[in-house]
């Protein structure tokens, strides 16, 4: 009965039927490729001075696409993925990753991690401060949290509702949530800046039209994962230079997403 309730709550936060489309798109789609470059670059920096055997955990690893980027960025460490949904973990298992199926509020780990990643997960959950606070307990002394979230309330649309987002964040809002959860923010910046005008226009037009039904929203959201030849490569090329500024810890002026590095106070 408790397991059934936990799964029902998890489904309120995320629709596991999306995993199939994600698994087919993540390695090629420009958005996921750009996000993985940012995550991989920062993960490599954050673990560069650690002795071999350091531990990295991705919470909400889904199909394992980001795990692969973390494994490439942290070749001297042990990278583990954790997710509640078996539907996503089945895809991650095919990649040969180290995996654990567990609830993020009850992680089965007796050791701390030098880096914990939470990538576009916390916006799905009702109590973001509680989640961030719980994850702080998984960090080894001096360990870092690396987190990404969707940015900008002005970009809210049917897409957010279809994928069960509860919020999009402003940079100051994410910094405040991290502070409430007991972290000191080391770096925080919007990213995906080059595509912001395109996304803003699409969302504005979507809000101006007839609200789609739930079924239409789901189909439209799945369409966001479609890889369009030519356009996909162009947008990937446009986003590629951004990672160099993030590697230098520059703060970008705007974007459709936010990345943050924080450490437990």
Name each model-derived stretch.
Residues 1-119, 129-132, 225, 229-230, ...:
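Conserved N-terminal segment of class I S-adenosyl-L-methionine
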Residues 23-24, 145-167, 171-177:
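Short, glycine-/aromatic-enriched active-site segment of Class I SAM-dependent methyltransferases
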Residues 119-122, 148:
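Residues lining the SAM
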Residues 129-144:
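A short glycine-rich, Lys/Arg-flanked "PGG" loop and its adjoining helix->strand segment in the class I
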Residues 183-193:
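Conserved S-adenosyl-L-methionine
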Residues 198-239:
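C-terminal helical/coil "lid" or tail adjacent to the Rossmann-like core of SAM-dependent
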Residues 204-206, 253-265:
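Core SAM-dependent methyltransferase catalytic element
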